[in-house]
From Swiss-Prot:
Gene Ontology CC, one term: cytosol
The species this protein was found in: Mannheimia succiniciproducens (strain KCTC 0769BP / MBEL55E)
Protein name per the record: Uridylate kinase
Molecular function per GO: ATP binding; UMP kinase activity
Pathway: Pyrimidine metabolism; CTP biosynthesis via de novo pathway; UDP from UMP (UMPK route): step 1/1
InterPro entries named among the record's database cross-references: AceGlu_kinase-like_sf, Asp/Glu/Uridylate_kinase, Uridylate_kinase, Uridylate_kinase_bac
Biological function: Catalyzes the reversible phosphorylation of UMP to UDP.
Compartment list: Cytoplasm
């Protein structure tokens, strides 16, 4: 087996990735597969931090358009990410992987409050640390949270798991001739207006020199291939 090229990663999972073909909620089989793929990385001595979105359970921006206060909607979205985090922690524990769930705000009795030094300590002990509740502030996406936590824990890369094989020049679902990029610079992504993540998250990563790798988590074994340096997905640096 190839050696990992990253020592510490921040894995960003979208909430939608957890729902599978269900269209809503959490597909237990997908959750269990992801837990086993993360377990593989731990066995390779890779330190893993995880940020999960909440779009499979709740979308604050949609309700904001319907008249709900955006702050309230975003708070509800943050709680959805905590629910996903609880599910992921449970799946990891069932796979015999030590995992810790941290929330950006206090939720006594449910999970720990985010603490930077504690997170670093646990990562060094090869425990998976799941960061939930986004950044803890409204108006910021979970992509922003992933880049922020990645920078804070000094990860080597932010791995953005999606439903497509990487970054394309146009939507591959609408255009079968869409071209997949293997490598891009931050400037190219902005110039070509490619949809990698929202601009606030992307510029945060760019300003701190945090590489982003976009890949398809739907492909079994793709996470391991990304971490061992196979030409999987798109790298942005």
């Amino acid at each position: 087996m190839n050696k990992p090229i990253y020592k510490r990663i921040l894995l960003k999972l979208s909430g939608e990735a957890l729902q599978g073909d269900e269209g809503f909620g959490i597909d237990p089989s997908i959750l269990d597969r992801m837990a086993l793929e993360i377990k593989e990385l731990i066995a390779m001595d890779v330190e893993v931090g995880v940020v999960i979105g909440g779009g499979n359970l709740f979308r604050g921006a949609k309700l904001a358009k319907a008249g709900m206060n955006r702050v309230v909607g975003d708070h509800m979205g943050m709680l959805a990410t905590v629910m996903n985090g609880l599910a992921m922690r449970d799946a990891l524990h069932r796979a015999d992987v030590n995992a810790k769930l941290m929330s950006a705000f206090q939720l006594n009795g449910i999970c720990d409050t985010y603490n930077w030094s504690e997170a670093i300590k646990m990562l060094r002990e090869k425990r998976v640390v799941i960061f939930s509740a986004g950044t803890g502030s409204p108006f910021f996406t979970t992509d922003s949270a992933a880049c922020l936590r990645g920078i804070e824990i000094e990860a080597d890369v932010v791995l953005k798991a999606t439903k497509v094989d990487g970054v394309y020049n146009c939507d591959p679902a609408k255009n079968p001739d869409a071209k997949l990029f293997n490598k891009l610079t931050y400037a190219e992504v902005i110039d070509k207006e490619l949809q990698v993540m929202d601009l606030a998250a992307f510029t945060l990563a760019r300003d701190h020199g945090m590489p982003i790798r976009v890949f398809n988590m739907g492909k079994p074994g793709a996470l391991r291939e990304v971490v061992t340096g196979e030409t999987e997905g798109t790298i942005i640096s």
